[in-house]
Amino acid sequence: MTIPRRTVLSGGLALSLFASRQVVAAEKVSIGQATPALSFLPLWAARAYQTFGAVGLELNWAAIPGGDPAALAALDAGDIDLAAVGSDTALAAISKGQPFVMVYSLLSKMSLQVVVSGPLLKRTGVTPHDPLVKRIDALKGAIVGVSAVGGTQDRVARWIAAQGGLDPKTGIQVAMVGPPPAIQAALENARIDAFVLSPPESGVAAAGGYGTLLIDPDADFRQLHGLPNLVLVARHDPDAAAAKRIGGAIAAMQQGAAKVIANPNDAADRIQAAFFTRIGQPIMRAAVHSMLDGLTGGGRFSAANIAVLTRFSAESGTPVPDTKDYWTNRFIAS
């Protein structure tokens, strides 16, 4: 039987194209994010600027209901390659023996802020210009809305209460409400007295006329400067393929962070258009600018910022792992 030369050529071409597609097919990396907060800024920027594709990866991103603990549970189950969570929650999990390691600092700054309702201001007579101790004391008995009980917002709220002499367990009431839009609605409708969220949420509440920024931990507590607040967490023992995906994902986020630093307004506009359409441009731009000093160092950990983290964790009641291998820079190429 004679096969026409054209058929052979077309078949060979098809095989060649198929092989080519196999070669260039992007590998998937899965990242779970505990809350849809802007403070995970390098990740938002990497998505907005599509830098995952630039490093040969296809991102499978998931917002995981339940906050930090749920994101870490997904990591433990092998459902995701990386969890984007609060560093204190990661430390607590590692201290309990879970096989995790912090691999990248998404934001080396305490970005969470305490915003309170108008009724609370009226009831207590406190103002944002009062001494810090008086502002903290105004939170006594307040209902503070968070995305997840036991998560970073919860821990920070209780730590702040303790700094003013309140009992961190009973001095405030912490209520799980949900993601930021639900928390905003709860404050606006007087179902909670306060929330602990990152920008742009303080700007949103102020623009809506129902919330006032009362405590800004980064400004009010100098001991928190440099804190690696939000981190990427991986399993402690990734195989070679997973390690390559992790390194590539970090490179993509470094590129995203570099874009933010180079042109904050452009980054804010892109992120807003893609993911935060409910936020006005001036508020979004101000929020991005407020986080720029948390993007230094290329996401690397240092002895200095780990010391800040361990001190904060000890003060907030978070156990610190006995071992010293709960963080690493080995996946960061440059």
Task: State the predicted function of each range.
Residues T7-V24:
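N-terminal export signals
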Residues D239-T318:
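Secondary-structure end/capping motifs
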Residues A26-D167, A175-M176, D193-P199:
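Short, glycine-/small- and polar/acidic-enriched structural segments
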Residues A54, L121-T127, A219-H225, L292-S302:
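Short, solvent-exposed loop/beta-turn-alpha elements that line the ligand-binding surface or hinge
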Residues T310-S334:
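Conserved C-terminal helix/tail region of periplasmic/extracytoplasmic solute-binding proteins
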Residues Q50, D79, A84, I94, ...:
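Sec/Tat-exported extracytoplasmic proteins
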Residues P181-Q272:
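Pocket-lining segment of extracytoplasmic ligand-binding domains
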Residues M1, A19-G32:
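C-terminal segment of N-terminal export signals and the immediately downstream linker at the start
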